[in-house]
Amino acid sequence: MVIYHLFGNVLPGGYLGVDVFFVLSGFLITSLLLREFVYSRTISLKNFWIRRVRRIAPAAISTLVICAAIAGVIGGDVNVNLGRQFWSSALFVNNWVQIAHSQSYFAQSELPIFAHYWSLSVEEQFYIIWPLIVSLLLVILRKTPRLIGKLALLGAVVSALAMAIIVDPGHDATRVYYGTDTHAFGLLIGAALASITISSSTEKRGDTWGYREGLLQHGRILSLLAIPALAVQIFYFFWLGDQDTFTYRGGLISSSLIVAIIIASVVRNNGPVAAIFRNKVLRHLGFISFSLYLWHVPANLFIVTLFQDYEWGRKKWITGLIAIVISLVAAELSFRFIETPIRRYGFIESTRKLSYAIFGERSTSRQRFGGAMVPAAMILCCVFAGLAIHNTSHGTALESELERLQAENRSERSAVKPAPKVVTHDVPKDGTNINAIGDSVMLASQAELQKRFPGIDINAEVSRHYQAAPAIIADLKAQDALRQFVFLGFGTNGQAFPGQLDEIIKSIGPKHTIVIAMPYGDRWYMQDAQQQVVDAAKKYPNVYAADWCAYADDHVSELASDEIHPRGNATVGYTNAFVAALKQWASGKKDVPPICPPAA
């Protein structure tokens, strides 16, 4: 997950790390519940939930508070919607709140600092509902643990089917990826695995898992199966893209089943795969992995925000490496001084020990000072976090700038002038014979387009899709204001619907020269949107592609923080892409560019 979030396409299937964690969590939690029932014939939900709070809350809440405080100090885009992010994460409903606000998990350049808390929310919701179901069946209805396994498998199948049915190929998959209903199968597969590996010993201090019974008695078979299972899982990490249809219609659940095989082999502690996971470094990374996961996203965003004006601060591999170092240090400190004491002694006893370190008769001056610094730092973080949440902004600096440009654009085009009757056969020197229709990327380049083509008619707005173009073109035609050259700048907010771009081109007509910008960005649909421009330029003699994508890909450091919108010199690059396309038209030599970056 860390590599996936910080280094983009280096590990396309890195998001599967969450599903590994889901299967493992479902397995461990259900093992605890079943083991307690086997030796005591009851399940203490109160004690179970107290243990979960002790395990999860210290790291989760401390990271929230500290990072919210840092975000408040840094300010800017990391502070956007901080209150909503904070409270939805603290209450473990982050996934549903993000779904409600149409936040895309797969638009990595706009990932909020607490977006990754979605998986923690799914787990916590499972930790509330699943123990109730297990307790009802085992304690009240007196069913067997094997029935729990069958029910878990049934639930996993239903959840996976829901994901496969609801997912809409070619559209953002965040809904099914974030949804507890559609992404619970990993947790349930882990639960099913627990039901067939749990020990039947009635001794309280007996083994949790039965190594000579159930599934685990087949140690040699498990060790042999684990080798290809691990190989396939590694292959998935490098191959299974987050927008592939197969991912949501078999990929994620098959990965979860593979992980279950690996876990069974590791628990049986037999074979080469189990030996790999006995490595001391991997074991320690496992201990701090929870905090590492919580810290890596905000740490990276803080680094990017603080140093985005430096050239090195725009290079993902540099900021990513720095973020990993910071996250490892923060995770280690959290594990040693926050998570472990509270997990061992509880909140009250940990507070008592801290108080003794400060005020106890045997405490040294150094211990008192160190002990006093902890609550002082906690109070300070809470104050700054509260101020940051209270002063949260509801839009990024880029969004505010685009709103300003949009207001200017609307006022400037209040009166549309009729198109000139003179037809030029060379690259136009001004914009009196050019209409430009587009989205926020064109809007961000408005000033440079007007500078290069004085008199150009620009109609660009934020969040605009191809869907808005037909009505605008019809309106221009009705006013006799559709000019010889028409610039189209779409694709940022989605590819055209089937046949939509053809409809737009035909409505403009073959007597007009159409130049379409090749869109750029990290959105899941971007390559499809680019391919549509390429296909249109090849299909229609009067359509040319403005290769904005190639320029943006070579000058990412010149883009805004979202790495989509141009700023400064990049607006010149955007404008020059249209100029280059017009030169192709004037020379009669069309050169249709490929999509960028190249399809894998």
Residue spans for each PLM region:
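Extracellular/periplasmic envelope-modification machinery, especially enzymes
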Residues: 240, 308-314, 318, 336, ...
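Cell-envelope and extracellular/periplasmic
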Residues: 487-491, 518-519
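Active-site segments of SGNH/GDSL-like serine hydrolases
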Residues: 505-531
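Active-site flanking residues adjacent to catalytic metal/cofactor-binding acidic residues
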Residues: 18, 438, 488, 546
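Structural motif
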Residues: 484-487, 513
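Hydrophobic membrane-embedded alpha-helices
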Residues: 1-386
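Short hydrophobic segments within beta-strands
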Residues: 23, 437-438, 517
